[in-house]
């Protein structure tokens, strides 16, 4: 479990409001493992549909301080002035190490940010920043689009 105090500390540290549904989930299940852990997105750089796996980052708490999950307070994108993005905060990672993020760029003071995927090792030729692809309009839409890879592709990806 993650306390409201820890959530408030995170929001205060970055000056954001997390989505209510995310708070509801994370206060009950810190860094939850999920079966339906895949999502689709459009790679506008290559002009093709892609998919990715996903796992939540978590918060260090008293109950996991000796084996904490990937710590959500480590905001590599927000803190990276050269390759990162202002108002983009990761809350999960893909199996390839890419960042699944809350994207507040359209509304930095809002509480229902878009969801995006930031590729950790590929860069936009024009800006030099990490590639960033939109995924969902908000956290609820993101959860709704998650699927189990084996159910969708029983014979593997073809």
Predicted regions and their residues:
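A surface-exposed partner-binding patch
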Residues: 1-98, 154-158
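Beta-strand-rich cores of mature extracytoplasmic or soluble domains
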Residues: 89, 98-102, 113, 118-119
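Acidic, proline/glycine-rich low-complexity IDRs
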Residues: 128-158
């Amino acid at each position: 479990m993650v306390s409201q105090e820890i959530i408030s500390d995170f929001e205060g540290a970055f000056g954001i409001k997390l989505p209510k549904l995310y708070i509801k989930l994370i206060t009950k299940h810190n860094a939850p493992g999920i079966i339906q852990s895949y999502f689709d997105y459009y790679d506008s750089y290559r002009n093709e549909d892609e998919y990715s796996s996903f796992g939540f980052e978590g918060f260090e708490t008293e109950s996991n301080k000796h084996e904490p999950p990937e710590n959500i307070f480590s905001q590599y994108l927000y803190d990276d002035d050269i390759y990162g993005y202002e108002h983009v905060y990761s809350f999960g990672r893909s199996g390839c190490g890419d960042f699944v993020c809350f994207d507040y760029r359209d509304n930095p003071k809002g509480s229902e940010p878009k969801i995006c995927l930031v590729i950790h090792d590929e860069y936009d030729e024009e800006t030099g920043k990490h590639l960033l692809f939109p995924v969902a309009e908000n956290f609820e839409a993101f959860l709704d689009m998650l699927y189990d890879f084996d159910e969708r592709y029983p014979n593997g990806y073809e």
